[in-house]
Amino acid sequence: MEIQVIDDAYLQCQQICKNASTTFYSSFSALGWEKRRAVHAVYALCRWVDDIVDGDEEPTVEISDELTEQTKQRDLMLRELHSGSEPSNPQEIHNQRLMALVSIRNKLHQAKEGKISPNDEPVFIALQDVFTKFSIRLQDFETIIEGMEDDLFPVMCNTWDELRSYCYKVASAVGLILIEIYGYEDRAARLHAIDLGIQMQLINVLRDVSEDYGRGRIYLPKDVLSSHNIDVEDLSNPNLPQNPSWASFMREYLEVVRRHQTSAVHLFEYLDPRSRVQPRIMLDAYTKIFDEIVRRSGDVFSAPLKLSVTSKMSLWMKINYLKIRAKLSAE
């Protein structure tokens, strides 16, 4: 494939990253050119599948008899996996989104095998190049898509293990891809990358609890809620934070987040200074959200949880500080 086609594909992935988050996009710039482009491609793929499942992007695929049959078989398997539950969306919308995910999975296999053409989506052109340069496992991409497929159905996590499994699929698997791009000195880095992903997604679950409830997605473990005398239906009550049972649940939940966070910080010991910047900023950003949850005494219902302007400025300054340190370390 011509170099210009590949370069153009990477540029489109870069633009997707920039449009999604200028703060995190800036943190990528500490990486070398080759690693930075690879991270853009991975992030663009993750953004794409997430938007498809949440309905933020209308999926378009080239329909064929083979793809239709693959989608049908995948749907049957997922229904069985979800104990016969009906999809969260009307059948037509469900089929469109699932078919898009099946098609993306097929294209990832083609990218791994070097069979992507110049006429394919730019993200697959870029990822095909990424596969040739880094030891990325196709399995981790498939795990991400499995997590997206789960969200096509009503979700009810019952235990901590089920919640961690979900977090692994949609967050830790991404981290396992990224550290293969960053490079690391010891395989222990993978364990800490897994905990970083779980820690971030556990915070996402709290941040989005009301929105997810409206979509039929209950990630907070039902059995744990019950042990604190909270019913799933109580999650629709904006006054729940005033209930002492919620305070009790939050103490347990936040302690679990802290344990994963304690492990996550050790990831940086295995990365070179330039590769530390992006995950360091991610950890710091989520820690700020976590601290805000603590400050609000667990009230994640009354107002959106997001980074303040001051926090964003603080992160921007830290990005530049870490980039300078990384540059000096490399000299």
Q: What role is predicted for each listed range?
A:
Residues 1-200, 210-331:
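Catalytic cores of Mg2+-dependent Asp-rich isoprenoid enzymes
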Residues 205:
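Short, contiguous alpha-helical
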